[in-house]
Amino acid sequence: MSNPSCIIIAITGASASGKSSIASTVHKELCNELGCQEIGIITEDSYYKDQSHLEMTERVKTNYDHPNSMDRDLLIQHLKNLKNGSAVDVPVYSYVEHTRTNETTHFTPKRIVILEGILLLTDERVRQLADISVFVDTPLDICFIRRLQRDMEERGRSLQSVIDQYRATVRPMFLQFIEPSKQYADIVIPRGGKNRIAINMLKAQILHLLNQK
């Protein structure tokens, strides 16, 4: 069944910039206003490439901040399917095994799909499919502190490993790919999830688009 009223919101920015917080806030508040059956979140992380054919020694070398780590074709196909009113089975990625699991998450068509990830606007096809593109513009030092706390507390990583990864891939890839993609955003949100005015503006624009469909 066609779903011409499906609106895709792409929310991007640096790792730990507050993307997930904004996506979660918008999702929760629109759930209350429209009903949770009308809105869903898909994370770009789910579309990292399957690496089950590689040995673990090769998998751990993955640069998760480079566009080549993503299965873009599958993501684009899923977005098109949702636009056309078809359900999709979103992959489940394991950072422990550095590859996809055998499980998927069944995602039914929604009026609003929030897509969240660091590399979204680096792909022209995603930009064309997104009805609203958002860049969360948070200073890199703040992002690093948040990432450091998160990875040590939630993922059991050492201080040195987080610092090494930040220097080797996170910061260089942000400067090379993510920051330049800000030019494609319709809305730039400073201060991340604490910017209440910007979140209200984003919600208002989403509701405006819904009324136009």
Swiss-Prot record:
Q: Which regions form coiled coils?
A: none
Listed InterPro entries: P-loop_NTPase (IPR027417), PRK/URK (IPR006083), Uridine_kinase (IPR026008), Uridine_kinase-like (IPR000764)
Where along the chain is ATP bound? G13, A14, S15, A16, S17, G18, K19, S20
UniProt KW keywords: ATP-binding, Cytoplasm, Kinase, Nucleotide-binding, Transferase
Question: Which Gene Ontology biological process is one annotated for this entry?
Answer: CTP salvage
Q: What is its main location?
A: cytoplasm
Q: List the GO molecular function terms.
A: ATP binding; cytidine kinase activity; uridine kinase activity
Subcellular location per UniProt equals: Cytoplasm
Reactions performed catalytically? uridine + ATP = UMP + ADP + H(+); cytidine + ATP = CMP + ADP + H(+)
What EC identifiers does the entry list? Answer: 2.7.1.48
- Pfam families, per this entry? PRK
> SUPFAM superfamilies, from UniProt?
P-loop containing nucleoside triphosphate hydrolases
Organism domain of life: Bacteria
Gene Ontology cellular component annotations, sorted alphabetically: cytoplasm
What does the record give as its pathway?
Pyrimidine metabolism; CTP biosynthesis via salvage pathway; CTP from cytidine: step 1/3; Pyrimidine metabolism; UMP biosynthesis via salvage pathway; UMP from uridine: step 1/1
Q: Which family does it belong to?
A: Belongs to the uridine kinase family.
What name has this protein been given in UniProt?
Answer: Uridine kinase
Name the gene: udk
